[in-house]
Amino acid sequence: MPLVLMTDARKADWAAAARRLPRGSVVVVRGQDSKKRLALAETLYGIAPLLIADDPALAARIGAAGLHLPEKRMKEAAHWRARFPHWIVTSSAHSLRALMGAHALDAVFLSPVFATTSHNGAKPLTPLRAAFIAGHAPVPVYALGGVTAQNAARLAPSFSGIAAISSLIP
């Protein structure tokens, strides 16, 4: 099952994590601080294909493989696809209703499937509910949120892959 490494603001050896990914994996470069996001993207460029989160200008500037949009910007996918037809365009989603607007995307990251420390207090969808949602999606769906090597086996075949943070960093 393909893997996606999602970065966040924590100090971690993201380059080492990216190098450990199996062939065909992708890294989504996220972060609120634009300077830190740029530095991280430059560090990771060439290690694995990069999707830049919520920053199309940076994605174009560094020659990223694509763009990752937050759920609230999912409707922009068709615009960015028209401007950059070679890009992979993804988005986050947190419900079945959100996924119904995903037609112009290449994939969606459905979260949180399990309880996760990166979004404390967020109610997990549960593997059963998440599988139901993924099974009705118009595009491939990746499970995100609290996914570990131990609980990944609980994910249904309706998922196209797994996206993770903590379980993929050394």
Where are these regions (language model features)?
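Conserved N-terminal beta1-alpha1 strand-loop-helix module at the mouth
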Residues: 1-77, 81-107, 122, 132-139, ...
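Alpha-helical hinge/cap motifs
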Residues: 143-146
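Nucleotide-sugar-dependent glycosyltransferase donor-binding/catalytic pocket residues
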Residues: 115, 148-149
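Short, glycine-/small-residue-rich phosphate/pyrophosphate-handling segment
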Residues: 125-129
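Short, glycine/charged-rich beta-strand-loop motifs at protein surfaces that mediate ligand recognition
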Residues: 115-122
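Short, flexible coil/turn micro-motifs enriched in small/turn-prone residues
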Residues: 116, 140-141
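Non-cysteine beta-strand/loop elements that form the S-adenosyl-L-methionine
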Residues: 106-114
